[in-house]
Structure formats: structure tokens, C-alpha cells
Amino acid sequence: MSELAAVLTRSMQASAGDLMVLDRETSLWCRHPWPEVHGLAESVAAWLLDHDRPAAVGLVGEPTVELVAAIQGAWLAGAAVSILPGPVRGANDQRWADATLTRFLGIGVRTVLSQGSYLARLRSVDTAGVTIGDLSTAAHTNRSATPVASEGPAVLQGTAGSTGAPRTAILSPGAVLSNLRGLNQRVGTDAATDVGCSWLPLYHDMGLAFVLSAALAGAPLWLAPTTAFTASPFRWLSWLSDSGATMTAAPNFAYNLIGKYARRVSEVDLGALRVTLNGGEPVDCDGLTRFAEAMAPFGFDAGAVLPSYGLAESTCAVTVPVPGIGLLADRVIDGSGAHKHAVLGNPIPGMEVRISCGDQAAGNASREIGEIEIRGASMMAGYLGQQPIDPDDWFATGDLGYLGAGGLVVCGRAKEVISIAGRNIFPTEVELVAAQVRGVREGAVVALGTGDRSTRPGLVVAAEFRGPDEANARAELIQRVASECGIVPSDVVFVSPGSLPRTSSGKLRRLAVRRSLEMAD
């Protein structure tokens, strides 16, 4: 077996900790010791070896103990894992099932494990070319199998596709193991004292890495379905309190949401938290500060805030601050005023970061903006269907940023920079200001630039809006952006909640919004 599977085997079998899984139907937490989870993984491996020994296994479903076990089960059987999301609310079951199986086939996955309603939906369509197995059956055969050695990948991870078509990153067992070890080393994970709590989806790199890093450490982990969080976001705080969690992770919008409506919070204890990772989307310094201040009466230590940087191409984490420092904000002053950016820490062990400015690399702490390039032991082997990348080469991320005294600062995506009248404007700065307007939905704002041929040339802000007075909200938004960003939007487009296109991981697809606006002209 791979070193990744071997190390996880030793950690899970020796662990005294538990995997606690929330049953969304009953709202009860089910306890599963990590050795039990590994036993289920061995059963899954035996099932896979009895069914054509697939090179890759697809997983779809809620984050049950069986699904978590199936990840290690696939690795014990020498197979790669690819996890895809379930249907969103309002989706057509047949179209979702067809699209999911088509995506699996497109990346070479011909064996899929699922359970419950997801399994029934997948089996309701034409499954030619795909073996669909019942995960509940596969995990409970009470059998074990001799682990299979494999030189193949461990994970076929979909990328976000927020600025283009999504691709599939090929992650080797060594890359995954290096990233998990680097993350645990940076935050100092200790199975004897730490408890993790997560609602992040396992098909997303941050959600998968959080679960696997806990398994690698043998640390207790409380795992809730993402749908349980979206149905009632403030339950997250109750889960943190009930579990005595010391570690959690979420994208920026979740912290903003809690901080914005903190008056709803009562009778929780967040005093144990020492690591609250913030990643997956741009960090709002003001919103994160508001969260920390609002949670302070409930024992939250602002030093636990860890705004971080990562991407699927590097397995997950690239830079993470040292716990205890808290949010560091770097101020940049230009012609439009002062702007705050979160400092995202230094590279985790095994990774390197540099800033490319044309034909040369910017020096450390030079604060010169350029494209962020990375390399290291956590890097992907390449994109599926494309040439492998040289592990010694620097990988251009497409993100713009600079290196400050406290580490990496990310300014935005190179493809999304708005150039107007000789100025470069990062859309996230405009979006954070626009989101402060009453009625504008948190995390549902897109700022983009349109060309001279558009009927609305210049800066356009599109936002999901729910409120009684669009006219006043539009005027306030324009005034705020003009005052704080130094540019006047040429147009503000309000759309109904849920209208802006997103990726499967929930990131806004800015280029898709641009195309839809151009088509409407």
C-alpha cells in the first residue's frame, strides 16, 4: 500500500479518539472510534477488490461514517478517490444523476459508491459503463483485504472553476500526506488535547483536508453535513460548544454571517477554540474582526483567527499563520486611499511561495504586487489530460499578491483585475464595501469591468438583493464605493437571491456574470 494509506492505518488503529457524525434526520451525534472507522475502510477495500479492482472510485453522499471510511478503503485497495457533490435544492434528480455520472466517466471513474437517496437517484438513470455500489453494504461486509500497492494517484480533485472551466488536479499519495503533515505541524495538532469540528463538504479540498488531518493525527473529530449548516448556520456555534472543539475551519462568508447577526447567539462556550481557519475565498478583515469581537463574550480568543491561503493544485494548504497571532492586516495606500488586506501567514513545511513580477521574482517583504507562484511536496502531478508538471518548476496560481513582513498577502485573481482609466482595481475590495449596504446578501456581490462597447462601460456591481427599497440601496452602494474605493460604479444591477452563478463549492463565477451581463446588453 502507499505510504499515505499505511500511515493512516497506523494512526486510525492506534487512536483513542472518535469520529462523531451528525445524523441530519435525527439531529443526533453518532460516535465511531477511529479504529472502527478503519475496520469499515477494510470492508470497503475488500468490496472494491471483489469488483474489478478499479483504478479510481467515485464517492457521492452525505458525510456519513461509511463515506469517510471509503476514502481510506479506496487507498487500501490501491485506487484513487474522486468525490462529487450531491444535488442542490431545486435540482432535477435525473439531470443531476446524469451529469454526475458523466463527470465521473469524463475523469476515468467507472466505479461509484453511494448510499441512501443519493444511491437511488444515481441508479434511476442509465448507468451504462458505470458500476454503482451501495456504500452501506460495502462498508459492513466485516471483511478485510490485503492492501494493494499502487503507484497511481490518491485523489482526483476538482478545481473551483471560478474564473474558467473547472479542471481535475491529480494528487499523489505523497503530495496528500505531505500537505496533511505540514498543516498539522503548523497548527500543532495534538490528539490528546485537540478536537476538530467541521461542516465543510468533503468534495472541497479544505473539507477533505480537515477530516484527513484529524484522522492522520488520530484526533477526535465532529463532522456535520454542510446542508445542516446551511439550514441553520448558528448551529455551528452550538456544535463547537458541545464538542469543546479546539479547531474548526470555514470560508470567510461564514464568519461574516455570524459576526453580522451575532445578536442571535446565546449560551455557547467558545473558550476552547485555538484554531479557526479562514480560507477558500477572500478574507474580509473588518468582517473577521467583527466576528472575533462579537464572539469574545462567549470566550472566543481573537488569537485563534487563522486567515490562510490554499488551492486544490497544492492538495489544500499553502500558507497558514502560527496559532495565537490572530488577524494581521496590512495597509496599502494608493491614489484612492488606504486598503486593508489580511496577512495569510508563511508557507507550511514542504511548500514555497514567491512573487513573480514580469521576468523576475520579488524579494521577501518587498510588498511588490505580482503573480503568486508556488512549489513543493504538496503539489499536484498535473491536470488530468494534460502534460505532467515538473516538481522543480514554479506553478503560477493566477492569484496576485505580495510578500509582507508577516507572510503572504493576496490581492485578487489576475483574470479578474478591473482596469479603468489607467487604474487597476481588485474586485474583492469593491465587493466587500458593497456588501455593507442593507438588503445586499452577504457573499453575493460581483464587481467587474465592462468594455467600451458595452451599454454600461466601466465598473459594474451585480448583487443579490432582498429589500423594500432598491433605489435607495443602489444610491447608497454607489456612494459607499465612490467614497471608500475611489471609483464611481457606472451601473448597479440587483438580482434575486440565488441568481448569481456559482461553482459546486459555492464560489461566485465572475466571468459567467460578465458574460450574462454582456448578453443582456
Curated annotation (Swiss-Prot):
E.C. designation(s): 6.2.1.20, 6.2.1.47
Biological role: Activates lipidic moieties required for mycobactin biosynthesis. Converts medium- to long-chain aliphatic fatty acids into acyl adenylate, which is further transferred on to the phosphopantetheine arm of the carrier protein MbtL.
Catalytic activity: a long-chain fatty acid + holo-[ACP] + ATP = a long-chain fatty acyl-[ACP] + AMP + diphosphate; a medium-chain fatty acid + holo-[ACP] + ATP = a medium-chain fatty acyl-[ACP] + AMP + diphosphate; dodecanoate + holo-[ACP] + ATP = dodecanoyl-[ACP] + AMP + diphosphate; dodecanoate + ATP + H(+) = dodecanoyl-AMP + diphosphate
Annotated metabolic or biological route of this protein: Siderophore biosynthesis; mycobactin biosynthesis
Deletion phenotype: Disruption of the gene decreases growth in the liver, but not in the lungs or spleen.
Induction: Induced by iron starvation conditions. Transcriptionally repressed by IdeR and iron.
GO biological process, one term: fatty acid biosynthetic process
Keywords, ordered alphabetically: ATP-binding, Ligase, Nucleotide-binding
Organism: Mycobacterium tuberculosis (strain ATCC 25618 / H37Rv)
Superkingdom field: Bacteria
Family designation: Belongs to the ATP-dependent AMP-binding enzyme family.
The keyword Ligase belongs to this UniProt entry's keyword annotation: yes
Record-linked SUPFAM superfamilies: Acetyl-CoA synthetase-like
Protein name in the entry: Medium/long-chain-fatty-acid--[acyl-carrier-protein] ligase MbtM
GO molecular function, one term: adenylyltransferase activity
CDD domains reported for this sequence: FAAL
A UniProt-annotated Pfam family: AMP-binding
